Curated annotation (Swiss-Prot):
Any one Gene Ontology molecular-function term assigned to this protein's record: iron ion binding
Family designation: Belongs to the HupF/HypC family.
Effect after changing C2 to R/S: Lack of hydrogenase 3 activity. Cannot interact with pre-HycE or HypD
Phenotype of the disrupted gene, per the record: Deletion of both hybG and hypC completely abolishes hydrogenase activity.
UniProt-recorded name of the protein: Hydrogenase maturation factor HypC
Site feature location: Important for interaction with HypD and the precursor form of hydrogenase: C2
Name of the gene this protein is made from: hypC
Pfam families: HupF_HypC (PF01455)
GO biological process: protein maturation; protein-containing complex assembly
Organism (species): Escherichia coli (strain K12)
Effect on the protein upon substituting C2A: Lack of hydrogenase 3 activity. Cannot interact with pre-HycE or HypD. Does not bind iron
Pathway noted in the entry: Protein modification; [NiFe] hydrogenase maturation
UniProt function note: Involved in the maturation of [NiFe] hydrogenases. Involved in the biosynthesis of the Fe(CN)(2)CO cofactor. HypC delivers iron-bound CO(2) to HypD where reduction to CO probably occurs. In complex with HypD, accepts the cyanide ligand generated by HypF and HypE, and also coordinates the carbon monoxide ligand. Involved in the maturation of the hydrogenase 3. Also participates in the maturation of hydrogenase 1.
Subunit structure, interactors included: Homodimer. Interacts with HypD. Also forms a complex with HypD and HypE. Interacts with the precursor form of HycE (pre-HycE), the large subunit of hydrogenase 3.
Length: 90
């Protein structure tokens, strides 16, 4: 099973972005979703679902918050989920 983690795009340089995932800045490749939206505007501030360093899809903020809440609930039961959220067990 693959789990994507929501993150908010902070900066973009070409197809690479700095994405905030639970307060941690991660390097993410935007090749699959593009660095600009359908109107040609940079995706800075938008939410993406991140898996193994790639933005897999663009999601809205409500979906991002719901997913983060669900992952946090999983973390409360299974500490290994912390690696997805925080980069290590917390």
């Amino acid at each position: 099973m693959c789990i994507g983690v929501p993150g908010q795009i902070r900066t973009i340089d070409g197809n690479q972005a700095k994405v905030d995932v639970c307060g941690i800045q991660r390097d993410v490749d935007l090749t699959l979703v593009g660095s600009c939206d359908e109107n040609g505007q940079p995706r800075v501030g938008q939410w993406v679902l991140v898996h193994v360093g790639f933005a897999m899809s663009v999601i809205n903020e409500a979906e991002a918050r719901d997913t983060l809440d669900a992952l946090q609930n999983m973390f409360d039961v299974e500490p290994d989920v912390g690696a997805l959220l925080y980069g290590e067990e917390k």
